[in-house]
Amino acid sequence: MGRCFGIGPFLCPPAQNIRKKITATQNILLYLQSKSKHMAMLAKFAVKNFRGFAEKIELDLTRHSNFNFNLYAIKDDVIKNGIVYGPNGSGKTNFSLAVFDIVNHLSQKWKKADYYANFTYAGDPNLKVEFEYTFRFDGQTVEYSYAKDYHGIMTAEAMTVDGKPVFKRADGKFTIDTEAFPIDKSIQHNLADNANNIPIVNFLLMSIPLAKDHYLIRLQQFVNGMLWFRNLDVREFIGLETSVYMLEEYIIKNKLIDDFRRFLLNVSGQEFEFAQPRAGEKVLFCVIDKKRIPFMAIISTGTKALELLYFWMQRMGQATFVFIDEFDAFYHFKLAFEVCKILFNKDCQVFTSSHNTYLMTNDLLRPDCNFILNENKIKPLVDCTEKELRFGHNIEKMFRGNAFKV
């Protein structure tokens, strides 16, 4: 294996080898790797009345096509990797935040402090925000839906597994599969009223002994592994971790300085000589003309973004679903391509949003993995045209020529 976080060398070439087509052999290797084990997957997501989305908007990751290239982007018949495009103000950030609402009540991981500010659709803040998730856990299909008011308080909740109802709470009523969860009538009555707004999933997880492969345990594990982050005016993240790290202190403490140096060289072509840290030092220093200069004092905004990405890539071994908002805001367009090749080979679902149409190429993904979000809809490119799309098509040129209509 290569030295780029366990990723084969053909996925982490020098930066000048941009858009080098993945050979048939490499594609087969990636496909076999993707088939090596089942993953817990987010298969569908829908939301209504969230911020700017007055109508229901749905992302269906089971609607993939039968392209015979870049097979690694599909796992267990679910889209594993994708990029979301859309005009400014179309709702890319808000949609990604909506996907991560589930972290707020099913996980003790890091939360976005202002998440529930401007939570509901501005046209009618009294409307309930409705969320629908479909997960795939080793052949099981778990559908989980709920509604929250403008304070973020849950007002309804329901779950089905393989089409069979598990529980439902709505309008002061509560039903549950008592064979699967034998709980007293008095408790069922209290859950119907639920004055203290305890999510039913959390109650069952805390009250009922479950097997380690039970779908509720799998759901909890999946949500604990969800990660959203961005690096714009401020660095923000949701999920996966319970505390904030100092990036360079983390690199030093975990003896990753040389690995970080190779990462910067491989993805961006930048070569730094890092000084050996002295006892107690928590920041990186570079050696320039035999002088120690603080790393942060000499690097660009884009390289700072790469440092943040490097940190999260170290943590992605624990991740299940990752969304990086405006991931390439400070990247050169070719650097963004190299970063995507690394991200999309991770053993978890990874999605990004971007305005960089250089990434809209069949050398990286497929037309069913590039999405356009606009006017309260999100669709893959294959559903935005009647034309049959093939590997040889220049989909970036087609996009710029307005060939795709949402």
Model-derived regions, located:
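C-terminal lobe/lid and adjacent interdomain/linker elements of RecA-like ASCE P-loop ATPase modules
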Residues: 22, 28, 32-44, 337-406
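Walker B catalytic acidic pair
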Residues: 325-326
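Post-Walker A helix-loop "phosphate-sensing" segment adjacent to the P-loop in P-loop NTPases
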Residues: 101-113, 317, 345-347
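Conserved D-loop-proximal element of ABC-family nucleotide-binding domains
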Residues: 329-333
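Pre-Walker A-like glycine/lysine-rich segment at the N-terminus of P-loop NTPase domains
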Residues: 39-100
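Phosphate-coordinating catalytic segments in nucleotide- and nucleic-acid-processing enzymes
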Residues: 27-38, 44-48, 56-60, 107-312, ...
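Targeting/processing segments of secretory and organellar proteins
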Residues: 2-3, 7-8
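The start of beta-strands in P-loop NTPase/AAA+ ATPase cores
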Residues: 320-321
